C-alpha cells in the first residue's frame, strides 16, 4: 500500500503562506546569499510551491518567469545551493535564502550574478547642520 501524503506535505504551511505578499503573478523575490561570507549570489523568484519544495528538500527551487516552470538550482550544472536558512523580510514581499553554494551561482559561470556589474554612480556629499 502506498504511503499516505498529508495535505500539509503537498502545500506550503498556512502560517507561512499568510505572511507572503506576492506580486500580480503570485511570485516573491528570493535573494540568495552565501551563508558564511554574506556574499549576494543571485536573485530568483518563488511561488508557494517553489518555497515549499525549497523548505522540504533543503535545496533551492525557483519558478522561472520566462519558461513558466520550476527549476532546482544545480540539477543541470551541478552547482547546487544547500539551504542553511530562509528569512522573510519585514514587508513579506521578499525572501533571503542563506545557502552553501557549490560552484558558480550564475549561469554565466561567475560566482555571483553581480560580479563585475557595478553601475557607475556618484553621490554628492550633503552637509547636514547639527540640531542644536
From Swiss-Prot:
- Residues annotated to bind Zn(2+): 90, 106, 113
Tell me if rRNA processing is a UniProt keyword of this record: no
Sorted keywords for this record are: Amino-acid biosynthesis, Cytoplasm, Histidine biosynthesis, Hydrolase, Magnesium, Metal-binding, Zinc
UniProt cofactor(s): Mg(2+); Zn(2+)
Reactions the enzyme catalyzes? 1-(5-phospho-beta-D-ribosyl)-5'-AMP + H2O = 1-(5-phospho-beta-D-ribosyl)-5-[(5-phospho-beta-D-ribosylamino)methylideneamino]imidazole-4-carboxamide
Entry's localization field? Cytoplasm
GO biological process per UniProt? L-histidine biosynthetic process
One Pfam match: PRA-CH
The positions making up the signal sequence are none
Query: Which annotated residues bind Mg(2+)?
Result: 89, 91, 93
In terms of superkingdom, the source organism counts as: Bacteria
Keyword Iron-sulfur present in the record's keywords: the answer is no
- Enumerate the InterPro entries for this protein: PRA-CH (IPR026660), PRib_AMP_CycHydrolase_dom (IPR002496), PRib_AMP_CycHydrolase_sf (IPR038019)
EC id: 3.5.4.19
State the GO CC annotations: cytoplasm
GO MF, one annotated term: phosphoribosyl-AMP cyclohydrolase activity
Q: Give the record's cofactor note, including how many are bound.
A: Binds 1 Mg(2+) ion per subunit. Binds 1 zinc ion per subunit.
Family membership, please give it.
Answer: Belongs to the PRA-CH family.
> HAMAP family per the record?
HisI (MF_01021)
Q: What does this protein do?
A: Catalyzes the hydrolysis of the adenine ring of phosphoribosyl-AMP.
- Protein name in the entry: Phosphoribosyl-AMP cyclohydrolase
Give the species: Renibacterium salmoninarum (strain ATCC 33209 / DSM 20767 / JCM 11484 / NBRC 15589 / NCIMB 2235)
Amino acid at each position: 500500500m502506498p504511503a499516505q501524503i498529508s495535505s500539509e506535505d503537498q502545500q506550503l504551511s498556512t502560517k507561512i503562506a499568510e505572511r507572503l505578499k506576492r506580486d500580480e503573478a503570485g511570485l516573491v523575490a528570493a535573494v540568495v546569499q552565501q551563508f558564511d561570507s554574506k556574499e549576494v549570489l543571485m536573485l530568483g523568484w518563488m511561488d508557494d510551491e517553489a518555497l515549499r519544495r525549497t523548505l522540504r528538500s533543503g535545496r533551492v527551487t525557483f519558478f522561472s518567469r520566462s519558461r513558466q516552470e520550476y527549476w532546482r538550482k544545480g540539477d543541470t550544472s551541478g552547482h547546487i545551493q544547500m539551504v542553511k536558512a530562509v528569512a522573510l523580510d519585514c514587508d513579506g514581499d521578499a525572501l533571503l535564502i542563506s545557502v552553501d553554494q557549490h560552484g558558480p551561482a550564475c549561469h554565466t559561470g561567475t560566482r555571483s550574478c553581480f560580479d563585475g556589474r557595478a553601475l557607475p554612480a556618484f553621490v554628492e556629499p550633503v552637509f547636514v547642520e547639527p540640531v542644536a
